[in-house]
């Protein structure tokens, strides 16, 4: 079975509707996706309804922005309701688990100031709690040195980091959905809990420069403005 458990729609900074996302997943022949928009679950219900009709499992999720100054991201899966943004990383993990969800660290160690947890912060988090999984394979550029650093970090902290996860961080529908996936056997949640998941890269992401620039505007300008307005 194949999952792409990190996908976005127009509800946050993705470039596709829920219908387009589901269609892309069916075309890519994945068995499961998770809708993980930034700080909102507005597209989840529609995607789940469309997925059910298409024979696709859609997990209710969210990519939550933690508080300043870190503003890193934590993904929650199997959520019943949105998780409030702006909390500490450890409180965000706790809020996900309080409603029975799984807490996942997305795209770690990318050398940017926000959005990607850094080694020292992740080490501090693991001093006080565990997580259910961490993306060890993703589409964002990491570089060979940081890739080795991530691999070594996972080996050293596997018991507290949970399952190895692969996800495309899909923002462009058919252009990137399924580029990086998670292979699993049986029930997805059970496979994550048992740590039997296997991250895989299936192809390169191919997104025209103009489309990528429009998405970056949505991410870096439109999304923060919506947060300031209280829309997220």
Residue ranges and their predicted role:
Residues 3-5, 9, 15-23, 42-48, ...:
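Charged catalytic cores and adjacent phosphate/nucleic-acid-binding surfaces used
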Residues 10, 22-42, 59, 101-104:
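Divalent metal-dependent hydrolysis catalytic cores, especially in the metallo-beta-lactamase
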Residues 38, 63, 108:
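Short, ordered loop/turn segments at secondary-structure junctions
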Residues 86-91:
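Ordered, amphipathic secondary-structure segments that act as subunit-interaction surfaces
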Residues 99-104, 108-109, 161-163:
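Short beta-strand/loop segments at the ligand-binding rim of alpha/beta enzyme cores
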